[in-house]
Protein backbone atom coordinates (compact mmCIF):
# COMPACT_ATOMS: atom_id res chain seq x y z
CA UNK A 1 0.00 0.00 0.00
CA UNK A 2 2.82 2.40 0.86
CA UNK A 3 4.18 3.12 -2.61
CA UNK A 4 0.77 3.58 -4.21
CA UNK A 5 -0.32 5.94 -1.43
CA UNK A 6 2.84 7.99 -1.80
CA UNK A 7 2.36 8.24 -5.54
CA UNK A 8 -1.19 9.51 -5.05
CA UNK A 9 -0.10 12.46 -2.88
CA UNK A 10 3.20 13.29 -4.60
CA UNK A 11 3.44 16.95 -5.51
CA UNK A 12 -0.12 17.59 -4.44
CA UNK A 13 -2.31 19.43 -1.96
CA UNK A 14 -3.63 17.69 1.14
CA UNK A 15 -6.42 19.63 2.83
CA UNK A 16 -6.78 19.45 6.60
CA UNK A 17 -10.47 19.22 7.49
CA UNK A 18 -10.74 19.75 11.23
CA UNK A 19 -13.10 21.59 13.55
CA UNK A 20 -12.58 21.27 17.29
CA UNK A 21 -15.39 21.12 19.85
CA UNK A 22 -15.43 24.88 20.42
CA UNK A 23 -15.67 25.71 16.71
CA UNK A 24 -18.91 26.35 14.76
CA UNK A 25 -18.30 23.61 12.17
CA UNK A 26 -17.59 20.85 14.69
CA UNK A 27 -19.41 17.91 13.11
CA UNK A 28 -18.31 14.70 11.41
CA UNK A 29 -20.97 15.26 8.76
CA UNK A 30 -19.78 18.79 8.04
CA UNK A 31 -16.15 17.67 7.88
CA UNK A 32 -17.07 14.91 5.43
CA UNK A 33 -18.69 17.47 3.13
CA UNK A 34 -15.73 19.82 3.59
CA UNK A 35 -13.47 16.97 2.49
CA UNK A 36 -15.68 16.29 -0.53
CA UNK A 37 -15.50 19.95 -1.53
CA UNK A 38 -11.71 19.90 -1.12
CA UNK A 39 -11.36 16.84 -3.34
CA UNK A 40 -13.63 18.40 -5.94
CA UNK A 41 -11.25 21.36 -5.86
CA UNK A 42 -8.26 19.15 -6.59
CA UNK A 43 -7.01 17.98 -3.20
CA UNK A 44 -5.13 14.68 -3.46
CA UNK A 45 -5.56 13.82 0.22
CA UNK A 46 -7.26 14.82 3.46
CA UNK A 47 -5.92 15.24 7.00
CA UNK A 48 -8.59 14.55 9.61
CA UNK A 49 -8.97 14.43 13.39
CA UNK A 50 -10.70 11.62 15.36
CA UNK A 51 -11.97 8.24 14.23
CA UNK A 52 -15.53 9.57 13.95
CA UNK A 53 -14.59 12.30 11.49
CA UNK A 54 -12.31 9.95 9.56
CA UNK A 55 -15.03 7.35 9.03
CA UNK A 56 -17.47 10.01 7.85
CA UNK A 57 -14.88 11.34 5.42
CA UNK A 58 -14.08 7.84 4.16
CA UNK A 59 -17.73 7.48 3.17
CA UNK A 60 -17.50 10.58 0.99
CA UNK A 61 -14.07 10.53 -0.68
CA UNK A 62 -11.61 7.99 -2.03
CA UNK A 63 -8.25 9.67 -1.46
CA UNK A 64 -5.48 8.96 1.07
CA UNK A 65 -6.22 10.23 4.56
CA UNK A 66 -3.71 11.37 7.16
CA UNK A 67 -5.40 10.53 10.44
CA UNK A 68 -4.72 12.10 13.81
CA UNK A 69 -6.37 12.28 17.21
CA UNK A 70 -5.99 15.52 19.14
CA UNK A 71 -6.27 14.83 22.85
CA UNK A 72 -5.05 16.83 25.83
CA UNK A 73 -3.42 15.27 28.88
CA UNK A 74 -2.60 17.04 32.14
CA UNK A 75 0.96 15.71 32.33
CA UNK A 76 2.20 16.69 28.87
CA UNK A 77 2.06 19.36 26.16
CA UNK A 78 1.93 16.65 23.49
CA UNK A 79 -1.59 16.43 22.06
CA UNK A 80 -1.43 15.14 18.46
CA UNK A 81 -2.07 11.38 18.64
CA UNK A 82 -0.10 11.44 21.90
CA UNK A 83 -0.25 7.88 23.26
CA UNK A 84 -0.37 4.34 21.91
CA UNK A 85 -4.10 4.26 22.68
CA UNK A 86 -4.89 7.11 20.27
CA UNK A 87 -2.44 5.86 17.65
CA UNK A 88 -4.11 2.45 17.69
CA UNK A 89 -7.61 3.95 17.49
CA UNK A 90 -6.71 5.92 14.38
CA UNK A 91 -4.95 2.94 12.78
CA UNK A 92 -8.09 0.87 13.28
CA UNK A 93 -10.01 3.19 10.93
CA UNK A 94 -7.88 1.92 8.07
CA UNK A 95 -6.39 5.28 7.15
CA UNK A 96 -3.35 5.11 4.93
CA UNK A 97 -1.21 7.45 7.04
CA UNK A 98 -1.24 8.14 10.78
CA UNK A 99 0.49 11.27 12.05
CA UNK A 100 1.69 11.85 15.58
CA UNK A 101 3.67 14.37 17.58
CA UNK A 102 7.32 13.46 17.09
CA UNK A 103 8.89 16.20 19.17
CA UNK A 104 11.39 15.37 21.88
CA UNK A 105 8.96 16.60 24.54
CA UNK A 106 7.77 14.41 27.40
CA UNK A 107 4.71 12.38 26.38
CA UNK A 108 1.63 11.60 28.50
CA UNK A 109 2.16 8.83 31.06
CA UNK A 110 5.88 8.99 30.19
CA UNK A 111 5.25 6.84 27.11
CA UNK A 112 8.22 6.58 24.77
CA UNK A 113 7.78 7.42 21.10
CA UNK A 114 10.22 4.72 20.04
CA UNK A 115 8.17 2.10 21.89
CA UNK A 116 4.90 3.42 20.44
CA UNK A 117 6.19 3.25 16.88
CA UNK A 118 7.71 -0.18 17.36
CA UNK A 119 4.53 -1.62 18.86
CA UNK A 120 2.14 -0.13 16.33
CA UNK A 121 4.19 -1.23 13.33
CA UNK A 122 3.81 -4.84 14.49
CA UNK A 123 0.03 -4.43 14.67
CA UNK A 124 -0.37 -2.38 11.47
CA UNK A 125 2.56 -3.21 9.18
CA UNK A 126 0.94 -1.66 6.11
CA UNK A 127 0.20 1.74 7.64
CA UNK A 128 2.51 4.68 6.97
CA UNK A 129 3.51 6.90 9.89
CA UNK A 130 4.13 10.62 9.71
CA UNK A 131 6.17 12.59 12.22
CA UNK A 132 4.78 15.99 13.20
CA UNK A 133 7.93 17.95 14.09
CA UNK A 134 8.75 21.39 15.41
CA UNK A 135 12.51 21.86 15.51
CA UNK A 136 15.39 20.49 13.46
CA UNK A 137 16.26 18.34 16.49
CA UNK A 138 12.80 16.81 16.20
CA UNK A 139 13.47 16.03 12.54
CA UNK A 140 16.68 14.18 13.38
CA UNK A 141 14.88 12.35 16.19
CA UNK A 142 11.98 11.27 13.99
CA UNK A 143 14.34 10.24 11.21
CA UNK A 144 16.32 8.06 13.60
CA UNK A 145 13.13 6.33 14.76
CA UNK A 146 12.22 5.38 11.21
CA UNK A 147 9.11 7.42 10.46
CA UNK A 148 7.95 7.11 6.85
CA UNK A 149 7.28 10.82 6.37
CA UNK A 150 8.50 13.96 8.10
CA UNK A 151 6.08 16.86 8.57
CA UNK A 152 6.79 20.42 9.70
CA UNK A 153 3.38 20.59 11.37
CA UNK A 154 4.50 21.93 14.75
CA UNK A 155 7.02 24.53 13.60
CA UNK A 156 5.83 27.72 15.25
CA UNK A 157 3.68 25.88 17.77
CA UNK A 158 6.18 24.50 20.30
CA UNK A 159 7.86 26.49 23.05
CA UNK A 160 11.14 26.24 21.17
CA UNK A 161 9.71 27.52 17.88
CA UNK A 162 6.95 29.82 19.16
CA UNK A 163 5.82 32.60 16.83
CA UNK A 164 8.01 31.42 13.96
CA UNK A 165 6.58 31.04 10.47
CA UNK A 166 7.61 28.51 7.86
CA UNK A 167 8.22 31.36 5.38
CA UNK A 168 10.57 33.29 7.67
CA UNK A 169 13.99 34.14 6.21
CA UNK A 170 13.08 32.81 2.77
CA UNK A 171 11.87 29.46 4.11
CA UNK A 172 15.18 28.80 5.88
CA UNK A 173 13.72 26.20 8.26
CA UNK A 174 12.15 24.25 5.43
CA UNK A 175 15.41 24.27 3.52
CA UNK A 176 17.23 22.95 6.59
CA UNK A 177 14.63 20.21 7.08
CA UNK A 178 15.04 19.09 3.48
CA UNK A 179 18.80 18.90 3.96
CA UNK A 180 18.44 17.00 7.25
CA UNK A 181 16.49 13.96 6.03
CA UNK A 182 16.15 11.83 2.94
CA UNK A 183 12.60 10.86 3.89
CA UNK A 184 9.66 12.54 2.12
CA UNK A 185 8.97 15.90 3.73
CA UNK A 186 5.37 17.07 4.07
CA UNK A 187 5.11 20.84 4.40
CA UNK A 188 2.51 21.78 6.99
CA UNK A 189 1.92 24.61 9.40
CA UNK A 190 0.99 28.20 8.52
CA UNK A 191 0.87 27.48 4.79
CA UNK A 192 -1.80 30.14 4.37
CA UNK A 193 -1.53 31.15 0.72
CA UNK A 194 -1.28 29.46 -2.69
CA UNK A 195 2.11 31.08 -3.24
CA UNK A 196 3.50 29.53 -0.04
CA UNK A 197 2.17 26.14 -1.09
CA UNK A 198 3.81 26.46 -4.48
CA UNK A 199 7.09 27.62 -2.94
CA UNK A 200 7.49 24.69 -0.53
CA UNK A 201 6.84 22.22 -3.34
CA UNK A 202 9.36 24.03 -5.53
CA UNK A 203 11.92 23.69 -2.73
CA UNK A 204 11.50 19.92 -2.79
CA UNK A 205 8.72 19.01 -0.38
CA UNK A 206 6.85 15.84 -1.30
CA UNK A 207 3.39 17.30 -0.65
CA UNK A 208 1.81 20.21 1.17
CA UNK A 209 -0.93 20.30 3.81
CA UNK A 210 -3.16 23.36 4.08
CA UNK A 211 -5.80 23.71 6.77
CA UNK A 212 -7.23 26.91 8.17
CA UNK A 213 -6.71 28.94 5.00
CA UNK A 214 -9.16 26.60 3.26
CA UNK A 215 -11.42 25.05 5.88
CA UNK A 216 -11.82 27.50 8.79
CA UNK A 217 -14.25 30.25 7.71
CA UNK A 218 -13.80 32.16 10.95
CA UNK A 219 -10.05 32.49 10.31
CA UNK A 220 -10.55 33.44 6.68
CA UNK A 221 -13.14 36.05 7.65
CA UNK A 222 -10.84 37.48 10.34
CA UNK A 223 -8.10 38.04 7.77
CA UNK A 224 -10.50 40.13 5.71
CA UNK A 225 -11.96 42.09 8.63
CA UNK A 226 -8.52 42.84 10.09
CA UNK A 227 -7.43 44.30 6.76
CA UNK A 228 -10.63 46.32 6.41
CA UNK A 229 -10.15 47.79 9.90
CA UNK A 230 -6.92 49.39 8.69
CA UNK A 231 -8.91 51.83 6.53
Swiss-Prot record:
Catalysed reaction equations from the record: an N-acyl-D-glucosamine 6-phosphate = an N-acyl-D-mannosamine 6-phosphate
Top-rank EC class of the record's enzyme: isomerase
EC numbers, comma separated: 5.1.3.9
InterPro entries given in the database record: Aldolase_TIM, NanE, RibuloseP-bd_barrel
Pathway participation: Amino-sugar metabolism; N-acetylneuraminate degradation; D-fructose 6-phosphate from N-acetylneuraminate: step 3/5
A Pfam match: NanE
MF (Gene Ontology): N-acylglucosamine-6-phosphate 2-epimerase activity
GO cellular component: cytosol
Domain of life of the native organism: Bacteria
Keyword Isomerase attached: yes
Record-level GO BP terms: carbohydrate metabolic process; N-acetylmannosamine catabolic process; N-acetylneuraminate catabolic process
UniProt keyword annotations, A-Z: Carbohydrate metabolism, Isomerase
SUPFAM superfamilies for the chain: Ribulose-phoshate binding barrel
Matching PANTHER family: N-ACETYLMANNOSAMINE-6-PHOSPHATE 2-EPIMERASE-RELATED
Reported function: Converts N-acetylmannosamine-6-phosphate (ManNAc-6-P) to N-acetylglucosamine-6-phosphate (GlcNAc-6-P).
NCBIfam families assigned to the protein according to its UniProt record, in alphabetical order: PRK01130.1
Family: Belongs to the NanE family.
The protein's name: Putative N-acetylmannosamine-6-phosphate 2-epimerase
Species for this entry: Listeria innocua serovar 6a (strain ATCC BAA-680 / CLIP 11262)
Amino acid sequence: MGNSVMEKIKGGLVVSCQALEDEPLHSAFIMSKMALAAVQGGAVGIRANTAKDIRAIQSEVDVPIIGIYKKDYDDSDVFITPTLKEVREICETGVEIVAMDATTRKRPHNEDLKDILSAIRKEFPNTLFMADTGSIEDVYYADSLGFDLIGTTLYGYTEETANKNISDHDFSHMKEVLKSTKRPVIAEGKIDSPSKARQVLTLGCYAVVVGGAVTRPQEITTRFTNEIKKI
